[in-house]
Structure formats: C-alpha cells, structure tokens
C-alpha cells in the first residue's frame, strides 16, 4: 500500500545455494496467493566467473583471515559473477516472467545526474546589497586595508578618491617620504601622474579579475570563502592561501591570501582562466589545532545536512597487493617481503611493468608455482579499493541537503562523509574546499602569544618588515632549524651558498629545491654571484627572467613569454603551459605553429629563433613551479625566520610545543636551543606549565610537563590548578593530596618522578619512588573523608607538612646510569648528565671530529668519531639482498648515522647493542641531506687509547728529585 502494488516485487535469486531454492518456492507461492509480481536478480560481487578466487582473497583481506581458515566468511559456490541474459533466462526458466520483469523495474527507475552545472550554496548578501555589489564593497574596504587607498564603487568600476600613503602602492617608485611632505594632500594624490599610474595598475587589475569572476558565475564562491576566512581571522585562527589562488588580487583584498600579486608579479589567469572553464580551487591552510573550528562554522552557517567531509579510497598498488594476497595465502612474512621488495620503487608502477623491469620478479613468477598463483590473483585485485577513509582536508558544501545529490555515510565519530571521492564530487558541480592544517601557523600564533606575555609586544606577522637584515643573516648562516620550508640539511647548505637578500630569493629557492630543477641550482648560485655571464635567447625574455638570473623557474614565466613574444592572451598562455606539462604531441604541434606565427607577427622573430624559444619553454614547463604557491610559502618561511632571529626563546618554545609528541624532533630543537645560547631546563612540578614556555631569567625555556611520556595534558592541568589555588608543592604527600587522584595516578606520578619533575620536593628520586604507594594511599583516604564531610581521624597529622618522613623512607639514590636512561626514555634527552661523560677524555683526545663537525668535512674523506649507540635499524639491501645495519651514534654534540654493510656487517655485528660505546673509523658521505659514515673499523670506545696511542710523554719537574 505504501509504494503501490504495481511497484512491489518479490525478489528471486539463484546462486546454487540449497537454502535459496527453499526460499524461492515459498516466494513463488506467495506471489500466486497475493497476486504479486516477481523479479529475478543476481547478486554480483565480481565480473567474471574465474575471478571467484580473487574475490575470496579480497574477503580474507577485509576480514583479516586466511584462505585455509574453514570458519571464515566466504561466498560459496562460485556463482556471484555477472551473468548474461541467456544464463539468467536458463536459471529461471520455470518463472520466465521474473526475468522479463527486470525491464519493467528498469523503466520505473529514473535517475538523471546533471553534469556541467554548478550547485554552489547561495551566499546571502546583507540588506540593500546584491551579491556582486557586496563583493565589490568588500574589495573596496580591502583596498584601504592593504594599500591605504580610499576607493569608491561606481557601477562596475572602482574609482580612487584618496591615497593616504603612496608608498604602499606596489608599483609606486616616488619618494618614500611622500606622505610626510608638508604639501601632500591625500585627496589630491591622483593629480600626481606617478601616483595615478600606480593606483591605476591596481584598479585595472581588480576590474579585470571581477569581470572574469562575474562572467564565470563565481561571485558566491568568493563570498563564501571570504566569509569563513574572515570568521577565522576574527577568532584569531591563522590562515594562508596556498597554490594559484595567491595570484589573485581579489583573494588578497578579501584577506584569503597574504601575498600581494602585484608586488610579486603573480598571474590571475594561472588561477582562474576564462578560456578554460573550470571552477576556482582555493586551498587554505589553517592553524592545525583550530582547523576543525572553521569547518564547524561552515556547518552552522550552511546547515549540517549541506556540509560533509569527502571520502577517499585506498587502493592496492603493486607492492601492497602482493603483501596482502601473500598474507591470506598463509605465506611467511619473509617470503612475502622477498617478493614485494622485487617490485621497483616507483609509486606509479603496476604489476605488468614490474614483471618487465624486475628480472628477479619475472624469474620467480616463471619458476615458482606459489609465486605465480599469488601474482595471478594480485593482477585481478590490483587497484581495487581496499579501504574507505576520510580525506585529510576536503569538505563539500551544497546548496541543498547533500543526501539529495550524492551517497553519504557516517564516520567513526558520527560525522558525515561522502561515498564519492574528490573528483566525482567536483563533477557534480558541488563546492569542494580544502581546509588544510599547517602546524607552522600554530607555531607562529603561539610564538606571538608568548612574545605578548613575556615582552608586552603585539606582533602582527603580516606587517613585519620584509627587509630585515637580522633575518637574512640567520638564513645565510644556515641557522634554519624550525624555519618553514628551509630546515632540511640541503636547504641549509643552499641558503649559505646562495646568500638570500629578499623574499623573492626565498621564493626561487623553494621552487628550485625539488627533483628535476635541483640540477639547475649550481648554475643558479653562480649566476647570483656574478660568476656566469647571463645571456637570453631573445631580448624580450630579459624582463621576464631577470629576477631569476636568466633561468626560467616558474610556470608564470612560461605564460608571460608566450604572451610577450607570440601575442598569446594570458588565458591562452595558461592552456599552452598545461599542454607543455602534459606533453600531448598533437596539441603541442598546434601550439608550436601558433607560437611561431605569433612571434613573427608580433615581434618579427624568425621561425628558427621562435622554434628555439619554444623548445626552451617546453623544457622549463616540464618542471616549472607555481610561483603563486612558492611566494605564499616563502612569506611564511620569512615570518618564521624573523621570529627566530628576534625572539629565539619564544620561537623555540613554540616549536617544541608543536613537536611535543615527537622525541626525535624535540632532541633536535633542544640541541638547536643550546647552539643559540638558550637553556632548556628540565620539567618541574612547581615551575613547568602544560607546554614549553619561556622562564624568568633570560634565555631560558622550561620543559612542558605534557611532553613527559605517560603524563598527559589532563594530569598537568590538574597540577596547575592546584598550584594556582595554593602555594608551591613542598612534598610528595602535598602533591598527591592537592591534585585530583583521578588524574594523578601511579603511572603518571612515577613518570614525573623518574623524569626529574619532582626533584624539587626534597628527596632523591629513589626515595620519592619508594613513597608513591604511601602518598597515593594517604591522599585517597583523606579525599574519601572529605567527600563524606568527615574530619580525618588523625586531624592535623594528615596535613602534608606534618607527615613525617622516616629513616626507612630515605633510600639510596639510583645509579646515574639508571637516572639517565629514564630521562632519555621519558624526555628524549638527558638532564642529570650524559652517559658519555666518563669517556669525555677519550673523546677529546682520540676522536678527530664529532657529529656536529662531520658535515663540514669533504665528501669521501676519512675521520674518527666516538660515541654511543642510541638506535639500531637492521634490514636487507634491496639491490643485493644482503643484511645491513643503520646505527645512530650519539656523542656529546648530537648524532650521526653509521651505515654498516657487506663484510663489515658480519665482522662487527657483535658490537651492535643499544647504549654500546664505540670508536668508528670510516669514510664520510656528505652527498645527501644528512651526513653518514661508512665504517672501515669499529672498536669499543674504552679500547681507543690502547689502539691509537703512539707515544707517551712524561714531564717530571726537576725539583721532584
């Protein structure tokens, strides 16, 4: 009755399962009894009948079982494939109407998916504004904020009325002190031809961008993005647009982007091209710990039913499908690992190419029956979706409830997630946005907040001077640990060699330091220092490539060259750039013809020279970088470098807070603090806060208690609350009685003691550790009495200061080695000393260098370094299959990697023990970011004097006799 009898069918299936035959007979009887129609269906799980074994393996992968498990889930018999019409007719020959009824059902189903239409939510403009008018109103306000220029909106034009400070105009070349001249009047500024010309550059660019945005129907898009970005800014959530969106003046004026596209020569057409009708794509980085707040705002503004995160599907690649199929077949880890490692290390390679390129894999496939079965199954499952998860950043916003447009599901936390991936969501014309999380923005915010607390200075990183010499000095010394995009060893070396003097230089280095263009770096450095005469294939390329010393680094340069030399529109030049990047031969031939003809027509350039330039553009387009993206990140890099140069304590504290959960990174940052003369004091229950923070008394950072392994933020907050409500803790009993016992449990208390955070409580660590049970028990008893409103039986005796510490409570302190081991485990660094301190005299007299100086040695030179093994990673070489060991050797300055393989592995493997002290003689490898040492000899550190002492000199004063 609900659906109408004509729309109600009884479903019949026949997969050779006996129970189905029983069910089908009953369904046929019901159909006769109640006058219902039947329809024959087929439960399809794989396309071909021969794929049943592969499907069985896939079920095992999903249920984490093995094929030989008789109790596992399975689809038996092998009948769940896509049958032909003839097969279905034969299966249901007793009820032929059930087969023909499938056509009736199909005709009743009507789903039309409209592609090519936009379904963006409509932004509701304030009263008295159209959407277009409101966007122009916001842009006029942005003109004043960014350029101190009063602009009036007149229809579709922006009219400049006042220029408060002409020096804020990016193309103004007049006096820097113009606004301070006694006769300067802002309302008369446009009468000055230089000021008028500089203002015109901005208004014409804005008119042009708005024309394209309106023509393509994206006004609501920019209002929506501008709205949630503005919400973020009002809430103090740092954000920055990445990618080609930074090339738009509109995004800059709406404060979506922080990059002035006029100053940095960025192109709008690289972002939004009227000749390539694609929706705009603005990727925005938010401070990673506040990103969820902005997503929640969009849910509240547009409705929870209209906003969802986008699903993503993990597929099985060549290596992973071999591992998965091998596991369900019951093969050993070693055997599966052997086969997987035969697949070349190429993320895009498939099994067919792997068999062509890997002789070992081909031989195993041809000669080993089990391997052939595994790979034949893997062929069927390769690229099949293995799992569904939530995209790290992508969000879709619809104009109506999303369940009307696409399939949805709930994630583990109850959030709404699409069952379509990113591209199909875009094909449906829905608004998809990337809300990305960037830790660096959290670091910048936290650093500025600390500067406000410690120095009373309100910092706005968007207003920092971009010509600060201290900042460039820091970069050029290679002191870039913690500096966004510039902190790798290779980047530090590049900064030192290049000598940065502007944000444009940082932009170039960020663009070059990638596979492909890295080969250009040595020549780029020589050109920077005037060691190479810069020549241009054509004089018209000089203004385009002058900024990058005659080398094309950016995609935008390719576009400008096509525009200036061959008369392309910038939109057409963007199509050329894309064609060059995709290397489509036929399209490239068409563009070459257009380019050569355009060069001749516009600039009378001969065909031979035009073809030469085209070849050059084609070469650079293959690896050219998006300048808008590079400039956006270069500014963030500069901001972090500025903060580190001027506020090192606050910056390093913010960095350490950011990496509290990463012991390896914390160790690097603590070492960096040491190099900068900043002391990192150990945790202290009376002094530390949740996070790392500047301490009183100069260049000092206090270790954050939440960074102690096993403690956690909840417990630390309870400690801080108790501390703020009273005085400092005086004893372990005092600590336990004042802090909520539900947070301060045994494991937390033991971690605090072993890390040294309770050293201020009057007893050594062994004694404190021994009192844990007593203190927690006494605290629990007192808390229970208080909750009942009772006074303790012992009254004042239960006050912490009155609890007597007996002689039996006073234990002998743990050995220094035990304390150091606990500190390293819980904090990531040593507090009470260093295990190598007893060997300091050996390191001083018998080491020829240390972990800090090895990077300065010539490549392939010999050296001798002593230290202690802090980590060992063992494995098998992908080339030879032989074992190797990667040893992290720690000395008093830091760590260095020791790669031991071949005969040296067998000779010295007995020395590979954690905390073992060694002297290593070997060859330096400085070819990669991090120096390595290939050892020729290893020996126990204590044997170094006997091995390397050649002479002993005795000096005996004469008066001894």
Name each region found by the language model.
Residues 417-421, 667-671, 762-959:
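Prokaryote-biased recognition of long, low-complexity C-terminal linker/tail segments
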Residues 1-797, 873-876:
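Alpha-helical scaffold/interaction cores of sigma-54-like transcription cofactors
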């Amino acid at each position: 009755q609900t659906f109408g009898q004509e729309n109600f069918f009884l479903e019949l299936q026949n997969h050779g399962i006996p129970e189905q035959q029983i069910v089908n007979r009953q369904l046929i009887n019901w159909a006769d009894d109640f006058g219902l129609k039947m329809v024959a269906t087929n439960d399809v799980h794989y396309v071909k009948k021969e794929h049943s074994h592969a499907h069985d393996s896939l079920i095992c992968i999903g249920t984490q079982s093995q094929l030989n498990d008789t109790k596992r889930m399975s689809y038996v018999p092998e009948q769940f494939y896509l049958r032909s019409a003839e097969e279905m007719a034969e299966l249901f020959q007793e009820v032929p109407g059930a087969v023909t009824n499938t056509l009736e059902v199909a005709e009743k189903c009507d789903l039309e998916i409209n592609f090519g239409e936009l379904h963006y939510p409509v932004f509701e403009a304030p009263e008295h504004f159209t959407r277009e008018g409101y966007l122009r109103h916001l842009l006029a306000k942005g003109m004043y904020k960014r350029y101190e220029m009063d602009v009036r909106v007149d229809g579709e034009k922006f009219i400049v009325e006042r220029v408060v400070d002409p020096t804020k105009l990016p193309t103004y070349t007049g006096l820097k002190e113009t606004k301070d001249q006694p006769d300067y009047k802002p309302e008369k500024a446009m009468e000055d031809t230089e000021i008028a010309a500089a203002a015109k550059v901005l208004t014409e660019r804005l008119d042009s961008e708005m024309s394209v945005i309106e023509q393509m129907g994206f006004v609501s898009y920019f209002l929506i993005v501008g709205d949630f970005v503005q919400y973020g800014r009002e809430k103090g959530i740092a954000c920055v647009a990445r990618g080609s969106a930074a090339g738009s003046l509109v995004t800059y004026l709406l404060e979506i982007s922080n990059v002035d596209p006029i100053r940095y020569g960025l192109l709008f057409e690289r972002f939004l091209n009227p000749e390539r009708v694609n929706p705009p794509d603005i990727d925005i980085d938010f401070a990673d710990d506040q990103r969820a707040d902005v997503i929640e705002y969009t849910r509240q503004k547009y409705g929870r039913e209209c906003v969802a995160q986008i699903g993503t599907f993990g597929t099985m690649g060549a290596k992973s499908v071999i591992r998965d199929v091998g596991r369900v077949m019951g093969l050993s880890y070693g055997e599966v690992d052997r086969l997987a490692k035969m697949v070349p290390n190429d993320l895009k390679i498939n099994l067919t190419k792997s068999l062509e390129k890997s002789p070992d894999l081909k031989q195993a496939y041809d000669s080993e029956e089990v391997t052939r079965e595994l790979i034949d199954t893997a062929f069927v499952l390769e690229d099949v979706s293995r799992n569904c998860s939530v995209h790290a950043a992508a969000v879709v916003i619809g104009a109506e409830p999303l369940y009307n447009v696409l399939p949805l599901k709930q994630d583990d936390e109850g959030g709404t997630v699409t069952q379509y991936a990113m591209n199909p969501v875009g094909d449906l014309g829905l608004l998809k946005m990337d809300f990305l999380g960037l830790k660096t923005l959290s670091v910048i915010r936290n650093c500025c907040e600390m500067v406000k607390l410690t120095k009373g200075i309100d910092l706005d990183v968007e207003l920092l001077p971009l010509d600060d010499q201290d900042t460039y000095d820091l970069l050029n010394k290679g002191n870039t640990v913690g500096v966004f995009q510039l902190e790798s060893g290779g980047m530090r070396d590049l900064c030192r060699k290049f000598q940065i003097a502007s944000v444009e230089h940082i932009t170039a280095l960020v663009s070059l330091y990638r596979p492909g263009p890295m080969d250009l770096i040595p020549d780029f450095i020589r050109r920077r220092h005037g060691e190479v005469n810069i020549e241009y294939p054509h004089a018209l390329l000089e203004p385009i490539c002058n900024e990058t010393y005659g080398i094309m680094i950016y995609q935008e340069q390719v576009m400008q060259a096509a525009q200036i030399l061959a008369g392309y529109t910038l939109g057409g030049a963007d199509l050329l750039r894309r064609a060059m990047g995709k290397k489509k031969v036929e399209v490239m031939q068409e563009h070459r013809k257009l380019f050569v003809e355009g060069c001749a027509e516009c600039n009378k350039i001969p065909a031979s020279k035009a073809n030469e330039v085209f070849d050059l553009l084609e070469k650079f387009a293959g690896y050219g970088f998006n300048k808008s993206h590079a400039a956006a990140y270069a500014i963030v890099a500069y901001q972090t470098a500025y903060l580190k140069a001027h506020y090192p304590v606050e910056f390093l504290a913010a960095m350490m807070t950011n990496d509290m959960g990463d012991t390896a990174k914390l160790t690097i940052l603590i070492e960096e603090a040491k190099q900068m003369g900043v002391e990192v004091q150990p945790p202290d229950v009376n002094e530390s806060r949740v996070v790392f923070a500047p301490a009183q008394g100069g260049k000092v950072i206090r270790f954050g208690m939440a960074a102690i392994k096993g403690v956690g933020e909840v417990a630390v907050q309870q400690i801080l609350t108790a501390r703020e409500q009273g005085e400092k803790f005086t004893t372990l009993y005092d600590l336990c009685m004042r802090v909520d016992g539900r947070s301060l449990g045994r494991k937390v208390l033991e971690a605090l003691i072993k890390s040294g955070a309770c050293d201020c409580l009057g007893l050594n660590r062994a004694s404190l550790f021994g009192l844990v049970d007593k203190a927690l028990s006494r605290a629990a008893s007192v808390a229970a009495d208080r909750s009942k409103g009772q006074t303790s039986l012992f009254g004042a005796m239960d006050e912490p200061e009155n609890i007597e510490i007996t002689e039996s409570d006073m234990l002998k302190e743990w050995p220094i080695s035990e304390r150091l081991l606990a500190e390293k485990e819980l904090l990531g660094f040593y507090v009470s000393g260093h295990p190598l301190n007893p060997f300091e005299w050996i390191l001083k007299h018998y080491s020829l260098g240390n972990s800090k100086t090895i990077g300065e040695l010539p490549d392939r030179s010999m050296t001798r370094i002593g230290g202690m093994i802090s980590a060992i990673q063992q494995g098998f070489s992908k080339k030879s299959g032989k074992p190797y060991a990667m040893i992290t050797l720690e000395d008093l300055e830091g760590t260095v990697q020791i790669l031991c393989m071949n005969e040296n592995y067998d000779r010295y493997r007995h020395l590979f023990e954690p905390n073992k002290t060694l002297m290593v003689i070997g060859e330096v490898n400085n070819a990669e970011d991090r120096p390595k040492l290939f050892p020729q000899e290893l020996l126990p550190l204590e044997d170094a004097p006997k091995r390397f002492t050649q002479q002993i000199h005795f000096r005996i004063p004469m008066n001894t006799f």
